[in-house]
From Swiss-Prot:
Role description: Plays a central role in cell adhesion in hematopoietic cells. Acts by activating the integrin beta-1-3 (ITGB1, ITGB2 and ITGB3). Required for integrin-mediated platelet adhesion and leukocyte adhesion to endothelial cells. Required for activation of integrin beta-2 (ITGB2) in polymorphonuclear granulocytes (PMNs).
Designated name of the protein: Fermitin family homolog 3
Xref: PROSITE patterns: FERM_2, PH_DOMAIN
Domain-related comment: The FERM domain is not correctly detected by PROSITE or Pfam techniques because it contains the insertion of a PH domain.
Subcellular location: Cell projection, Podosome
Main subcellular localisation: other
Recorded GO MF terms: integrin binding
Length: 665
């Protein structure tokens, strides 16, 4: 028994004194001293601490933090010897859940209690459960960017911070619904207001504020965001996060599974907000026509949100049935993520045959587009000088598996081009296909996109892909093509009220156009979406965002093995992209479906990947930790294993196995 003394007061056993500080990491925190032995287990030490404090309260959330080892002592049956704790250990007895401020995708601030002792992935599951967001595996936390020091001390405007620190959910029990919202949000007017903030789109930002916010001016600037992601396999405490710190909550993985407006109002709204701010802050590029469509959708969504039309459709349109089918398949999956239809192998593979204009940019050439007879079968594109020569040898045959497919469209100018970057021994071979009209473009574009993923036009998703492309093009078409609704007047005079175009477009368009030039263009585009309900408009916005060429690419500065210069590595949901840093051109693409294995040498901070056909790629990370690249690859592979039949069941162990590293902390 610890603490046996002789008559003179000397200890005669193997006990020793252990000092424990009470509270969070604070040099001035009060402390108490316990008499323990190496055989004392953590549970017994916790009991002694509570007895010494002599204060009645709920201590169930408290645990011991070992400062030197950056470790929580959560195994209460382990002894001090097993942990390796000696008398010089700095131990803190404090709560495992502590308040943090989250900056949400809609840019609003929310204070809640997060776990500082569990791996971040598990903490995210709890946070998303509190916020009523399904599929927490798609989200993560970033460190807030450091604030620039200003020469003049400007008084920061006061910001409303919503508070959920007093809301506690019972573990293992699905939150009940009450009055159309999760029951824990209906406890008070404050929590109810918080739910409305989460589930309803925010009004357009102040144009002056929008111009002052930092925006990336180059591809290099876009890499800075991705250096701030927290490690999913370590807890907040291990990563230096303190109580009261501000963190950003964002969708990290651009693979959105089973997006349902009925069950996902918060997830849908926050995803829309992240897409909206990506466009407004120029994190992703779009054309002038596309920006007008995005502005019109924002204007329409804001009108419905302000009028209180949250769930009821603003009109009906039989033509939306096919679009709804396309939207239901918006999840982006890796190849092989689900078994292919058995009937696919029994049917004949559809072909595309048509006249297209083709252009192959080469150095020192002035030749433009030339018309050819083009045949597209399975994943192979062949083109001939004329239709009569088709049975013979083609001018060129291209296998599109693993290629980059980039749209180059101007609807008002009747320009429907497809840019293909096809892998070749010399790098990426560039070729342009010019289509005659929207229908031809949609068929060929859908075929190219599927072929790039190794799938053919016999795939069940081909028709929905064609419809989704046509739907996006129809939004860019000028004139009232959407069919009106009596509840939403179509005329510019009736719709212009409250429209400030500068809050709906990126700053580069603010500089290019005056407000009186933007307003009629936005209202004209609005006629194509005026019949949509709020959730339909948000889904259409997300779909249009997903159609952009640069959608879903996270950028990191790396240096490839054997190279003397830095380059950009783009990480998408199904591929890695090598990009020239100086000009932004794609140099090479590697598909995850062709990847055999990857590993990280934590000592030299190098990622090595092996692909089929004995292709080996190795690089060191410059702008971010190689852990971030490792986690992206493992995370996307994990997301590809999700199946609709399993519902919301989440294999946390598999995620941590695929994304967790062995980095020496």
């Amino acid at each position: 028994m610890a603490g046996m003394k002789t008559a003179t007061g000397d200890y005669i056993d193997s006990s020793w004194e252990l000092r424990v500080f009470i509270g969070e990491e604070d040099p001035e925190a009060e402390s108490l001293t316990l008499r323990v032995t190496g055989e004392s287990h953590i549970g017994g030490v916790l009991l002694k601490i509570v007895e010494e404090i002599k204060r009645k309260q709920d201590w169930s959330d408290h645990a011991i933090w070992w400062e030197q080892k950056r470790q929580w002592l959560l195994q209460t049956h382990w002894t001090l010897d097993k942990y390796g704790i000696l008398a010089d250990a700095r131990l803190f007895f404090g709560p495992q859940h502590r308040p943090v401020i989250l900056r949400l995708p809609n840019r609003r601030a929310l204070r809640l209690r997060a776990s500082f002792s569990q791996p971040l992935f598990q903490a995210m599951v709890a946070i998303c459960r509190l916020l009523s967001i399904r599929h927490p595996e798609e989200m993560s936390l970033l460190r807030a960017p450091e604030k620039e020091k200003k020469k003049k001390k400007e008084k920061e405007p006061e910001e409303e911070v919503y508070d959920l620190t007093k809301v506690v959910l019972v573990g293992g029990v699905a939150p009940a619904s009450f009055r159309g919202m999760p029951a824990h949000f209906s406890d008070s007017a404050q929590t109810e207001a918080c739910y409305h903030m989460l589930s309803r789109p925010q009004p357009p930002p102040d144009p002056l504020l929008l111009q002052r916010l930092p925006r990336p001016s180059s591809l290099l600037d876009k890499t800075q965001l991705h250096s701030r992601w927290l490690d999913s396999s370590r807890c907040l405490m291990q990563q230096g996060i303190k109580a009261g710190d501000t963190l950003w909550l964002r969708f990290k993985y651009y693979s959105f599974f089973d997006l349902d407006p009925k069950t996902d109002p918060v997830r849908l709204t926050q995803l829309y907000e992240q897409a909206r701010w990506d466009l407004l802050l120029e994190e992703i590029d779009c054309t002038e026509e596309e920006m007008m469509v995005f502005a019109a959708l924002q204007y329409h969504i804001n009108k419905l949100s302000q009028s209180g039309e949250v769930d009821e459709p603003a009109g009906t349109d039989s033509g939306l049935d096919d679009l709804d089918l396309a939207l239901s398949n918006l999840e982006v999956k890796l190849e092989g993520s689900a078994p292919t239809d058995m009937l696919d192998s029994l049917t004949t593979i559809p072909e595309l045959k048509d006249h297209l204009r083709i252009f192959r940019p080469r150095k020192l050439t002035l030749k433009g587009y030339r018309q050819h007879w083009v045949v597209f079968k399975e994943t192979t594109l062949s083109y001939y000088k004329s239709q009569d020569e088709a049975p013979g040898e083609p001018i060129q045959q291209l296998n599109l598996k693993g290629c980059e497919v980039v749209p180059d469209v101007n609807v008002s100018g009747q320009k429907f081009c497809i840019k293909l970057l096809v892998p070749s021994p010399e790098g990426m071979s560039e070729i342009y296909l010019r289509c005659q009209d929207e229908q031809q473009y949609a068929r060929w574009m859908a075929g190219c996109r599927l072929a790039s993923k190794g799938r053919t036009m016999a795939d069940s998703s081909y028709s929905s892909e064609v419809q989704a492309i046509l739907a996006f093009l129809s939004l860019q078409r000028t004139g009232g093509g959407g069919g009106g609704s009596g509840n939403h007047p179509q005329g510019p005079d009736a719709s212009a009220e409250g429209l400030n175009p500068y809050g709906l477009v990126a700053p580069r368009f603010q500089r290019k156009f005056k407000a009186k030039q933007l307003t009629p263009r936005i209202l004209e585009a609005h006629q194509n979406v005026a019949q949509l309900s709020l959730s339909e408009a948000q889904l259409r916005f997300i779909q249009a965002w997903q159609s952009l060429p640069d959608f879903g690419i996270s950028y990191v500065v790396v240096r490839f093995k054997g190279s003397r210069k830095d380059e950009i590595l783009g990480i998408a949901n199904n591929r890695l992209i090598r990009i020239d840093l100086s000009v932004g051109d794609v140099v090479k693409t590697w598909r995850f479906s062709n990847m055999r294995q990857w590993n990280v040498n934590w000592d030299i901070r190098q990622v090595a990947i092996e692909f089929d056909e004995h292709i080996n790629v190795a690089f060191s990370c410059v702008s971010a930790s190689c852990r971030i690249v490792h986690e992206y690859i493992g995370g996307y592979i994990f997301l590809s294993t999700r199946e609709r039949a399993r519902g919301e069941e989440l294999d946390e162990d598999l995620f941590l196995q695929l994304t967790g590293g062995h980095e020496a902390f």
